[in-house]
């Protein structure tokens, strides 16, 4: 276990600046969005959007969300967190293992007193720490910005909803990253894992967000998309506990299944010299 924690520590120190830059960068974008909301008339925006065709509004969901500062922020930040950070996490997950195979250093790593389970487990542990810390920095900056905003203070600062949204974002991004990690244990190739991981991400986005425009007979395809189980508006604006519990449970199961699957496949995998 000493080697396990040592490996996690090495990866954290290696990526520490990336964590700060990414978390701080997304947090800065959030700060500007909060400042923008401060100067906007959200009610007027709702009136404008109400004139749009019904099919267009289905993509945004409840129109009243646009008139709520938390709703507008969630749509601008959390609904696109997969784009701001998810793609980078997919790339990181794809390269953590396969990079060592391609550089012919994996035999040296496995020759140390560490099992394959612990070796891959240390990289998966780092991946979740990476996601949790990056998103944690982003959420802290966002919370500070909201606490300083008169509009958000008037609406109320809901720490429990914010915490719920944080855990859902971590599990959502963790699931997207673990899809790429699972693929990387099969192909042991950064290019293949990244390409497939990003392709699956966009396919899931399409299925999870645009199923409402599909024929009713095939709309059940939405259930295979990770995006369908990520509904931050329902947590932050509507405080819908039932949907939150459902999403957290299913995302948790997906994460665990991908972790276990990755460990089993890597343990049985023949590593090329």
Q: Can you name each region flagged by the protein language model?
A:
Residues 1-26:
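Aromatic- and glycine-rich beta-strand/loop motifs that create alpha-glucan
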Residues 31-34, 67-78, 121-176, 180-181:
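Secretory targeting signals
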Residues 89-93, 141, 175-179, 226, ...:
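Hydrophobic/aromatic residues in alpha-helical transmembrane segments
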Residues 7, 14-15, 32-72, 186, ...:
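Terminal transmembrane helical anchor/hairpin motif
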Residues 73-99, 198:
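Long, hydrophobic alpha-helical segments
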Residues 90-111, 124:
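Transmembrane helix boundary and interhelical loop/hinge segments in multi-pass membrane proteins
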Residues 168-202:
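A structural motif at transmembrane helix-loop-helix junctions in multipass membrane proteins
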Residues 115-116:
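Short coil/turn motifs that cap or connect alpha-helices
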